[in-house]
Amino acid sequence: MSAEISAADESRGISLLDLAEVLDQHKIWVESGGESGIKADLCGVNLARADLTGVNLQGAFLNKANFRGADLSLANLRGASMVQADLRDANLLGTELRGANLMGATLYGAEGLWVGRLGSTNLFDAMLPEAVATFDGAKAIAQATRFSQWIYFLILSSCAVCAVVIAFTTDVRLVLNSSAIPFLRASNAVPMSGFYLGAPLFILLLYLRFHFLLLRLWGNMAALPSVFIDGNTPEKDGPWFLMALARRHFRWMRDSRSPQAILETVLASLLAYWIAPVTLFFFWLRYLARQDMRGTLLHVLLISLSVAAATCLPTVVSRVLRPGDLPRKSKAIFPVMLSTLKVTLLSACLLFLLSFGVIRGMPADSSIAPEMTGSDIRRWAAQGLQFIGFRPYADVTEASFSPFPAHGDWSDEGVAAIRGVRLNQMNLRYARAYHTFWVNARLWRANLEGAYLSEADLRGANLREARLHNAVLDRVRAGRAVFVSSDARAINMSGADLTGADLSYGIFEAAVLSNAKLFGASMYAIDLRDAQLLRTDLSRADLRDAKLERAVLALANLQNADFSAAKLIGTNLTGARFKDGIFLDSNFKNADLRGAVLTGAILRDANFEGANFEGADLRGAIGLSAEQLCASGHWRWAQLDGDLQAATQARCGASQPAFTGPTSPN
């Protein structure tokens, strides 16, 4: 009894007018978010048996205040400091105490006190009614975290498995869409495309499910005291890797933390918030080599969603676990969203630009497409990824995409029986594919722009309508291969073996085919303008209606080739061998035929206007008339048959006889 009297004597009184003024100023302070008004300070004030129904004392200083027997029903005491306050026999029906500091306070005998109103409070050394004091918070936390722990470890294990698969993924398996997990019995159950597009979606859904469970857990924890009577905290009753996420949001835990607690918080945050975005980033990075725009954009979207969750969820958790804080002054919604999502927007834009730059751009290596400078904008994305030591284009050097022939039968029949790989419409831009094996491969409409396939084996491969712009196919074996309607501008096929290949309707403008073997090839209506065919073997090839303007066919072998209706305007044919070739209605306007051998060639109706026949051997040519030679103006030093020479001199009125060569002895 003496203790109660002394406590009452220590408290100071306050008039009703002063109390009303304090409450009014405090209300303004709360409503303005602390920008105006005065925060109430009623420390040590005697308010015993006062009628304080519905008052708003949120965040007020009420240390050692005497509320014994007072009516505080429906009052707002959120976040108030009530250290050693006397609340005995007070009416606390509907009173909001969330976030209040009740350390050492006396609430014994208080009426209407409910544990659900004590969320985030500090109850250390407080005296509570028996019904409230017996509440077991440890059991509630253990039950709430059980399922969350299972999902947490499922995410970690899934990300670990995915990281291992990504680390062991080769470009060959990625291109072939082979099994992502090759040791499974059903080897085709999880193809690469399914794994790289399905696994990220699964991880994101699992990640979001986990954090929705955590939000429910944080909500349950927010309904519990932050500090119990014995000084324990809820985090001690749950696993550290989950509780550490909420530690910095609890008012009574974040003020004094040990280095170990800081390390736990950082590690827990990295694992819970950033393990999924980082894993999705590696999915995106590894999948770039497949050059699949749709799949890559899906990765960018999933990464953006995960980054948005990782950056926004801590703010949501803070609002859930700190209910005693003052409400912030309302702001325009767009700036708030922009501030919260700025990391997400920046990462999404960066990944999109890198993806577009890789799939539509070119490698950082200046030796590829040397006509483009090293600072060209199309190289920026590859140069950016090169800083982390990653080349975003496939490297399948010396790989075998098609199986070898059965029983080691390398005869023509055995090679023709090989079942080639199906890679129709595959994107292999700027891939490194030196000495690869593509026999009978299906590459319809494949994109091989800038690809390096030197010495590759493409026998019987189908590259119909393929894009081969600037590709390097020197010394390839491509007998019987199909290049119909392919876009092979500026391709390098020097020294290639294209015996019996079909290049009809192909665009080989500015291509390099020097020393290539095109014996018996079908090249109907091919576009070879400005192409280099130095010493190329075109014997028995079909080049009807071909476009060969300004092409170089010096020293080329054109024996028995069919150039009917071909356009050879301005073509360099010096030293070429036309023996027994067919050139019906061909256009040789301004062509250079110096030293060419046209013995036995069929030249009926061919146009030789402005052609240079100096040193050319036209003896035995079929269908060649004096009118054709007169049109050239450069026939005088050509080797002609005697009758053709006389007819030409008579028609052209030559002032100088044509060179007929040595007379054969009789």
Residue ranges and their predicted role:
Residues E4-A138, I368-N666:
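Tandem repeat scaffolds
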Residues S158-C162, F195-A223:
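Hydrophobic alpha-helical membrane-embedded segments
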Residues K139-C159:
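Alpha-helical transmembrane segments and their helix-start/interface "positive-inside/aromatic belt" motifs
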Residues V164-P182, L285-R286:
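Membrane-helix interface motif
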Residues L217-T265:
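Charge-rich cytosolic interhelical loops and cytosolic tails of multi-pass membrane proteins
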Residues K329-P363:
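Internal/C-terminal transmembrane anchor helices
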Residues K139-T145, S179-G198, R257-L263, A289-I303, ...:
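Membrane-interface segments at the starts/ends of alpha-helical transmembrane spans
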Residues L267-G324:
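Membrane-embedded alpha-helical segments of integral membrane proteins
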